[in-house]
């Protein structure tokens, strides 16, 4: 009898780059580039796999991160989602690919129904929807936060803004939309 592997659902983390490019060490710059955090105030949403967590911990002094919830992710997709060609992500575009709303996509990603938010070419059979949003850019450009930041030199645990902040990342994201 063959054993079926159970799919592991990792938590989803929002990672926001808060510090700029000058004087960034090469290994940190490479890791930020691999995470697609190439500019200040850019956000990516990633699964919490051990390799991704290791990368985030390496760039901990340049980013802030925490668990994103479905409501915040739906708002980000609605207001800041872009598709290739720098066009906004619209409800009509989602419906063309079989999704009914931004909330449905966000919930499917957070619960692990889909593995990735963005992908390139997708072949979908009729009556099925793709396992992602085709041609969605894998990062989100945000505004600087309303009300400003406390300090980009101190960690969140000591009154700054860098490092792990848990579910409080959702408040920061809403201030940056």
From Swiss-Prot:
Any single Pfam family the record assigns to this protein: Ribosomal_L30
Cysteine-cysteine disulfides: none
CDD domains the UniProt entry points to: Ribosomal_L7_archeal_euk
GO-annotated biological processes: maturation of LSU-rRNA from tricistronic rRNA transcript (SSU-rRNA, 5.8S rRNA, LSU-rRNA); translation
InterPro entries associated with the record: Ribo_uL30_ferredoxin-like_sf (IPR036919), Ribosomal_uL30 (IPR039699), Ribosomal_uL30_arc (IPR005997), Ribosomal_uL30_euk_arc (IPR035808), Ribosomal_uL30_ferredoxin-like (IPR016082)
GO cellular-component term (any): cytosolic large ribosomal subunit
GO function terms (MF aspect): RNA binding; structural constituent of ribosome
Keywords: Ribonucleoprotein, Ribosomal protein
Quaternary structure and interacting proteins, as annotated: Part of the 50S ribosomal subunit.
Family: Belongs to the universal ribosomal protein uL30 family.
NCBIfam families per UniProt: PRK06049.1, uL30_arch
Entry protein name: Large ribosomal subunit protein uL30
Species for this entry: Pyrobaculum islandicum (strain DSM 4184 / JCM 9189 / GEO3)
